[in-house]
């Protein structure tokens, strides 16, 4: 590359960096609301990448975290990389994430909320997708002063006297969720929920798509599949939460995906009903969106607009 062309490219890069800086400044100088995004099983903070810019452009701050064992914190079972896959070995290979518990997850959410406060946020709303509803609940149960709102997106959550896993045993959930057949190992044996994100089996990939993302573009879903990791700790679903008094005052919203084949709609309704019974002074607002489980990929703009309305 000659010097003149290099300078043109450098100038273009500087302009892009300046534009990015303007977006960041807008996010900080506008609304004092920050959304702390918490992903679900097998995902990472990257999964909010189509939602965050919309909220940033509207003037809101966002913090998307990687939970322990996920995203850049992921650890892979040794048998996962061997192809062709030894299915029997993969099904019994203990998960390197088996020792991660809900305290680890909740601590990561608290750190995310503290980062938002340190950046100037006067209002912090934690958004948990799917499994992510569990750690945002535990984080707010222990540190309610950090959170002004909790948003459950197609999520599971504990309530007093009932762990999140209890909702997986509901008749409609157990009968109609499509996710169970996609698990390739017994969670009790390996200590995790395991899927094969590198599978080339068309039937298996079709099963995952039906369960998680029936309405997501195939090209985008292929990219998502390359970013997913195979394991998610299972112990968190059996842990009971202890709720501080301040939790009852936190505004709660449940966004239910009406085409969800993973956390079926009736399960979301049951969680909301139990929350309202536990904390009648601050009822949980139930909002429906026509989407599969992976709403952040299927309907990112609609989801972002719903969240902006809660700021």
Pin down the residues of each PLM region:
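Conserved alpha/beta-hydrolase
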Residues: 56-90
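Conserved hydrolase catalytic core segment
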Residues: 127-160
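N-terminal export signals
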Residues: 5-26
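Conserved acidic catalytic loop of the alpha/beta-hydrolase fold
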Residues: 106-122
């Amino acid at each position: 590359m000659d010097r003149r062309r290099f300078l043109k490219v450098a100038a273009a890069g500087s302009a892009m960096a300046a534009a990015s800086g303007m977006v960041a400044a807008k996010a900080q100088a506008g609304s004092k609301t920050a959304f702390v995004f918490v992903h679900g099983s097998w995902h990472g903070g990257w999964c909010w990448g189509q939602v965050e810019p919309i909220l940033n452009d509207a003037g809101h701050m966002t913090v998307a975290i990687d939970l322990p064992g996920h995203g850049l914190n992921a650890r892979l079972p040794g048998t996962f990389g061997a192809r062709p896959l030894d299915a029997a070995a993969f099904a019994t290979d203990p998960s390197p994430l088996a020792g991660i518990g809900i305290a680890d997850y909740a601590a990561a959410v608290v750190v995310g909320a503290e980062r938002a406060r340190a950046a100037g946020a006067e209002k912090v709303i934690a958004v948990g997708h799917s499994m992510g509803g569990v750690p945002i609940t535990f984080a707010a149960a222990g540190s309610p002063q950090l959170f002004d709102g909790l948003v459950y997106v197609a999520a599971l959550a504990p309530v007093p006297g009932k762990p999140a896993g209890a909702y997986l045993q509901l008749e409609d959930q157990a009968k109609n969720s499509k996710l169970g057949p996609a698990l390739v190992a017994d969670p009790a044996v390996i200590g995790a929920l395991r899927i094969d994100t590198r599978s080339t089996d068309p039937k298996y990939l079709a099963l995952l798509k039906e369960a998680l993302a029936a309405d997501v573009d195939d090209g985008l879903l292929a990219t998502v599949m390359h970013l997913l990791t195979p394991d998610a700790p299972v112990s968190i679903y059996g842990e009971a939460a202890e709720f501080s008094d301040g939790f009852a005052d936190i505004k709660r919203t449940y966004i239910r995906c009406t085409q969800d084949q993973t956390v079926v709609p009736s399960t979301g309704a049951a969680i909301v009903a139990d929350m309202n019974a536990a904390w009648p002074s601050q009822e949980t607002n139930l909002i429906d969106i026509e989407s599969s489980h992976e709403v952040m990929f299927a309907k990112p703009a609609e989801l972002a607009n719903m969240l902006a309305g809660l700021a």
